[in-house]
Amino acid sequence: MGYSDKHKLKTSNLQLPVRLLLGPGPSNLHPRVNQQLISSMVGYTDASYYKVMDETMELMRYLFQTDNHFTIPISGAGTAAMETCVSNLIEPGDKVVCLVSGFFSDRIYQMAVRYGGNILKVDKQWGQWFALEEIESALVQHKPSLLTLVFGETSTGVKQQMEGVGELCKKYNCLLMVDCVAALGGVPVFVDDWKIDACYTGTQKCLSGPPGISPLTFSNAACHKIATRKTPVANWYLDCNLLGGYWCPEFNLADGTIAKEEKSTIPKRYHHTTPANLLYSLREALVLLVEEGLDNVWKRHQDAAILLYAGLESLGLKPFVPQLNEAPEKGGRLFSLTTVNIPDGVDGKMVMKYLLDNFNIEIAGGIGAFAGKVWRIGLMGQNANPGNIKLLISSLSDALKVNGFNC
């Protein structure tokens, strides 16, 4: 058995094009966030690393607008955070209602059925959101222990109404799990005020960070559910009973109490090697958020979206979601992601290719039921600014004219 050069690929230094990423994610990295990817590597038991962990958890509480002690980053993309919620909160015999009105709310359902519960899918046409009456009807009829929904649906650009949903879940003794991957950091989210029990996001969208690490928060009620399961969490890597021992060993998941001892004296229990430089970059993204102020960040995303709507109208284009509804708790357009109807007779793929080839601008097409019907334009994180929108509208005008659309 000899040494082989069969797969010894001859390569040069990696050189990637510089794109303006105005699709559904990722967004462009903020330079300060990017710089943290080459910060010094330290061991995962180093005191300086523990300090980064603690600061990041506190900054995430600001992001989520929560006092939840169990607020940690998951090692993995947003889908890993989704599966953390599903695998920890569902066990055999549990009845779960999944509200499905888009690609990613359906992904939650597809994931949930693998964990042995009685999973009930409540469908609504893509591009719509669930009214409070519909949600209450599902809770009354099915009596679930968990309700899942997506607040900002990446596939449709729809913002789900949140007003009153948490109160209904408490009324019917049901935990509430909310996907905020395309929304958190771009539009207002109030985990505590909205009585959300499990919430998560990704770093690569409205935080302008690299993918691969995902903020997550659990209420004390969710933690109690996890700690008092009748069966072990079926996913060892994402088991929050184990993850808590590393991130927050001072916290008792079962009763929500915090140990009285000095935190530094409570040993962390190793679980897995966390992606250190991704954690540094997440921390820096959150520091930037604090420096600008959440209210200012939200307003910047809203102002950018409204400027985009005006630009689209000037080209004769229409957002797919007609309702604006600026109040954060109301259903309507998601300011961080806009779906745009592709005009009749226009080749949507050719327009996207023209933007990419001639202007290095990336927007995306629809997925699932919306494939070939819409473009998806993301104004996320640092990319939500007037200069990018003016450049996009000007470039899009050229792309449309080349493809025979009179604008």
Curated annotation (Swiss-Prot):
Any one Gene Ontology molecular-function term assigned to this protein's record: alanine-glyoxylate transaminase activity
GO BP, sorted A to Z: glycine biosynthetic process, by transamination of glyoxylate; glyoxylate metabolic process
UniProt KW Transferase keyword: yes
Pfam families (UniProt xref): Aminotran_5
Modified residues annotated as N6-(pyridoxal phosphate)lysine in this record: 205
A GO CC term assigned to this protein in UniProt: peroxisome
Swiss-Prot/TrEMBL cofactor(s): pyridoxal 5'-phosphate
Highest taxon of the lineage: Eukaryota
EC number of the protein: 2.6.1.51, 2.6.1.44
Alphabetic keyword roster: Aminotransferase, Pyridoxal phosphate, Transferase
Gene3D superfamilies linked: Aspartate Aminotransferase, domain 1 (3.90.1150.10), Type I PLP-dependent aspartate aminotransferase-like (Major domain) (3.40.640.10)
Top EC class of this enzyme: transferase
Catalytic activity, as annotated: L-serine + pyruvate = 3-hydroxypyruvate + L-alanine; glyoxylate + L-alanine = glycine + pyruvate
Record: residues binding substrate: 376
Protein family per UniProt: Belongs to the class-V pyridoxal-phosphate-dependent aminotransferase family.
Function, as annotated: Dual metabolic roles of gluconeogenesis and glyoxylate detoxification.
Name used for this protein in its record: Serine--pyruvate aminotransferase
